[in-house]
Each structure stands twice: as C-alpha cells, then as structure tokens.
Swiss-Prot record:
SUPFAM superfamilies: Epsilon subunit of F1F0-ATP synthase N-terminal domain (SSF51344). This is ATP synthase epsilon chain. One of its GO terms (cellular component) is proton-transporting ATP synthase complex. The lineage of its organism: Bacteria, Pseudomonadati, Pseudomonadota, Alphaproteobacteria, Hyphomicrobiales. Belongs to the ATPase epsilon chain family. The gene is atpC. It is found in: Cell inner membrane.
Length: 135
C-alpha cells in the first residue's frame, strides 16, 4: 500500500482540498506528473487541465484547473490554482466564457510572448471543452 501525504489544493475562491492522499496527477507544463509520498522536492507551473486525486480513503476526485503553481516536498503537495472547480461542477457556459475572453484578449494583444501563452491557454480550454463537457 502506498504511503499517504498531505495535499492542499487552494484557489482564490476557496480551499478545495486539505487532507491526506496517496496520489495526485497534475498537468505540469512539462507534461502530466504523478506526485506520491517521498517525491523529490520540485516547484512547477501548472497548465490548464485535469487534476486527479486519489484520497487515502481510496476514493478518486477530478478537478479542472485553469493554471497555477505546485510546490512539492517529500511530505506535502501544495497546489495554488488560478482557478479550479470539481469536474462535476463544470459547465459548458463556464468554459465557453473563458474561451471567449481569451479570444478577445488575443485579438487585442501584440506582444508575441503573451500571444503564445494565450494560444496555449485557448488550446487547453478547447480540448477540455471537447473532452469533459457533454454537448
């Protein structure tokens, strides 16, 4: 049986999770990363995607994250989200609103670095819209 570790998942709106877990899969910018107890210390940027949590009880939870930052130590994972919601609370309207805002910002942006980040965000949001939210 895998060891458990402390997991804090925080967004500006609320504390989503603060409890013992056995495993968390996060959408890091370098690719999906599975975090377990005794993980090497790491700090990474989180891209929009799905966070999958395996709780100490054996239950699994899925959350959509819209970007953020992860601080990983051997005993703890702290996930600071720009915004996040449980998958079952996500609506097509929420995703479409974020996509439209990003498109409008992209149209008004001339900075190449910012345009690239917006294009990556739009790609992730479009993918989530097609995969997670039923028509």
């Amino acid at each position: 049986m895998a060891d458990n570790f402390n997991f804090e998942f925080v967004s500006p709106e609320r504390l989503l999770i603060s409890e013992k877990v056995s495993e968390v899969v996060i959408p890091a910018t370098e690719g999906e990363m599975t975090v377990m107890a005794h993980h090497a210390p790491t700090m990474t940027v989180i891209k929009p995607g799905v966070v999958t949590v395996k709780f100490a009880s054996g239950k699994t939870g899925k959350y959509v994250i819209f970007g953020g930052f992860a601080d990983i130590t051997p005993e703890r994972l702290t996930l600071l989200a720009e915004s996040a919601v449980p998958v079952d609370e996500l609506s097509r309207d929420t995703l479409m609103k974020r996509i439209e805002l990003a498109k409008a910002e992209l149209d008004d942006t001339e900075n190449h670095e910012h345009r690239t980040k917006l294009e990556q965000f739009l790609n992730a949001m479009t993918h989530l819209n097609g995969v997670l939210v039923p028509a």
